[in-house]
Amino acid sequence: MAATGANAEKAESHNDCPVRLLNPNIAKMKEDILYHFNLTTSRHNFPALFGDVKFVCVGGSPSRMKAFIRCVGAELGLDCPGRDYPNICAGTDRYAMYKVGPVLSVSHGMGIPSISIMLHELIKLLYYARCSNVTIIRIGTSGGIGLEPGTVVITEQAVDTCFKAEFEQIVLGKRVIRKTDLNKKLVQELLLCSAELSEFTTVVGNTMCTLDFYEGQGRLDGALCSYTEKDKQAYLEAAYAAGVRNIEMESSVFAAMCSACGLQAAVVCVTLLNRLEGDQISSPRNVLSEYQQRPQRLVSYFIKKKLSKA
């Protein structure tokens, strides 16, 4: 039965934490259609399909998340030459989902609306599968502030464009604000894993989540621009002073929803450019491809390390 009451809004931070839903209406439903996943509780046995899941990694594109499942499969010794990973969400072109062992890999598209839809259905999937002790990590790309391209940022706090650690949504015409808490212990574990790998620079910092790639992030090269270069530089410098080290478009709702539903969550993104020095991503494709593999390698190593201690 779904969690209800005022206390349900506060996710506990301990090691034995079931996935919870903050919606009493779910308990009244005879069938739940996860439309964007092409899965339904009447046709699919969620505990049999997903009950062993302990780690979920989400990222923007289907191809990147398929590459990740291959990466983690190899790291865990579960991959073999020629093995294919079928898309569990075949039949819909909205999201892609792959699984190997206790690891689920899901694409979420770009921006808050797209990842929000995915998270609603993903969290319900984990709930119906009776999963517990689930760690969920967003891996992706971002624009850095004051960092060399290729630097990996582990998010300490997801902040909005006013540098506040909260996610605001309009629900039935009213403002609803949720905290964007991330698991501090998980941040330190990931940072230690990066030090053990010793392959690339990794820092901990705040991540600013915006509603747009162009004006929302202070770019000067969009179809619209209502500010000067001086305005842009002043804003980015203020962000840096507030502890922001990278910018993307998903972390705030990701942190808010995962925290509320009892999921240990982290965000690990590589920076593709230093926004204090420009707006356009101009590195060669092969360089960008290697950058994008860095969060995958770090998180794969982390998962292997955690499973070896289980």
Swiss-Prot record:
Pathway note: Pyrimidine metabolism; UMP biosynthesis via salvage pathway; uracil from uridine (phosphorylase route): step 1/1
E.C. designation(s): 2.4.2.3
Protein's UniProt keywords contain Transferase: yes
InterPro entries: Nucleoside_phosphorylase_CS (IPR018016), Nucleoside_phosphorylase_d (IPR000845), Nucleoside_phosphorylase_sf (IPR035994), Uridine_phosphorylase_euk (IPR010059)
GO cellular component: cytosol; nucleoplasm
Chain residues that bind phosphate: 60, 94, 138-141
Induction: By vitamin D3 and a mixture of inflammatory cytokines: TNF, IL1/interleukin-1 and IFNG/IFN-gamma.
PROSITE patterns on file: PNP_UDP_1
GO MF assignments: deoxyuridine phosphorylase activity; identical protein binding; thymidine phosphorylase activity; uridine phosphorylase activity
Alphabetized UniProt keyword annotations: Glycosyltransferase, Transferase
Source species, domain of life: Eukaryota
Subunit structure: Homodimer.
Family: Belongs to the PNP/UDP phosphorylase family.
Cited function: Catalyzes the reversible phosphorylytic cleavage of uridine to uracil and ribose-1-phosphate which can then be utilized as carbon and energy sources or in the rescue of pyrimidine bases for nucleotide synthesis. Shows broad substrate specificity and can also accept deoxyuridine and other analogous compounds.
Matches recorded under NCBIfam families: euk_UDPppase
Name by which UniProt lists this protein: Uridine phosphorylase 1
Native source species: Homo sapiens
Gene name in the database record: UPP1
